[in-house]
Amino acid sequence: MLVFDIETDGLLEDLTKIHCMCIKDTSTDTMYRYTPENIEDGIKKLMVAGETICGHNVIAFDLPAIKKLYPWFTVCKDKVIDTLVYARLVFSEVNYIDNKLTRIGVLPKRLYGSHSLKAYGYRLGVLKGTYCETEDAWAIFTPEMLDYNEQDVVVTEALYKKCSKKTTTEQALSLEHKAQWLMVRMENNGFTFDKEKAIELMSTLQNKQIEVLNQLAHMVPRIPDKVFIPKRDNKSKGYKAGIPIQRYKEFNPNSRQQVLWIMKDYYKYPFSNPDMHTEDGKIQLNEETFKLIVKDTEAPEEVRKLAELFQENFLLTKRLGQLIDGKNGWLKLVSEDGKIHGHVNPNGAITGRATHRKPNIAQVPHVGTEYGKECRELFTVPEGWYQVGIDACGLELRCLSHYMYPFDNGEYANECVNGDIHTKNQIAAGLPERNMAKTFIYGFLYGAGDAKIGQIVGGTAEHGAELRKKFLKETPAIKKLQSYVKNLLSEYDVGL
């Protein structure tokens, strides 16, 4: 196997040269070092027929970088091992590992949870070096850069060996690599974005928010600030020495503290609905809470109107945040090619699901929500192309049924694929509505406590405990799976 790493003068979209390259042939334990004068020799070495090549983040960076500057370069994807992909697969619980490592000083806190090569260097005790921290480190080639490059290969090989000791399957590793290749291709292709229509939507949302804020400004009471006691008279300001003056805060519609004071302290709204609270009992001010207040027939008309305006302002703020105001606003991320090149990590969550950033395309509002259709239609295709949408069905429950198979001979799996699993869960939990069953099962699977589960039926933590007990009684395979996992984990220490 050939373990390699390159150093360039910039990121993928900007780089103009590869300064150096190091390749470790693990079969002979030989390190090859390539400088600007013989870089092509190193690139040709990677193309040796039948040789497996290995590197960290090479699918997303190193290999595309080489291809960009040397178009004749080609590699067999099935012969590529990316230790970033490998590590994400076998060390998905890296945050739990890092709790201890940061506490004892092995890993710097800034690298907590990171899958970077630098972070793994600390975890494995094979440090990368600090050359990259020097000023203009990548402007020109230096011997120190080559040494740093070689150390990256050393860390990569150590990480590969560590990953190889973890239990996984060739099928899983192959699947994750295929997903990474596909996501990189998708990111490079980008999503065609209708910028003109986005600007129109921005204007519509901003004008609507101005209208909402004007209504709020005329309705909200003045919010008390600190009491000011002047030490001397001030005729122009009307101050009298020693006479207290009540000052007031400027109204900030996005301040949850101010909104809570208006609703709870000034209007005495009780927030008695359990769905208005977090699991630890705190009032949560969000769109859902305000929608519940609007529907509360016992609330005064003025309170319901305020709740409606607050809810709409929160919604508009959220939509404008996604569109333009936020750090990753869509309009800020449109490239010169008219596309948004969002990043997808196909194994970013501890559950094995994908994560998205710059921007989070998965959070584009769906058509059933306010302004959802207008947001969705911004993401389009080049002229002459057709856009097709697909969705996966019941992923979590299908995965769950796989692990339940030894305990129920595939009964749950059969219901997932051929029946209506949410209706089955509804009956098992004794819930009146199918949608309640969907909310319940996902909350249950992701660790919701009794209080949270109780909220599903508008009850207490005691109701939640009873609901959980009934569901486990009617679905014994899940209870057996829980016991199996607990017993299995008790035999191991979590860590690298």
Predicted regions and their residues:
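C-terminal RecA-like lobe
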Residues: 377-381, 387-390, 398-399, 406
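Hydrophobic "anchor" residues on beta-strands that sit immediately upstream
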Residues: 1-3, 52-53, 78, 387
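Short acidic, Gly/Ser-rich segments with clustered Asp/Glu that frequently serve as metal-coordination loops
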Residues: 6-13, 59, 392-399
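Conserved "right-hand" nucleotidyltransferase catalytic core of DNA-directed polymerases
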Residues: 1-7, 15, 29, 104-112, ...
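Metal-dependent catalytic core segments for phosphate chemistry
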Residues: 17-20, 396-429
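Short, amphipathic alpha-helical "recognition" segments used to contact nucleic acids or chromatin
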Residues: 436-446
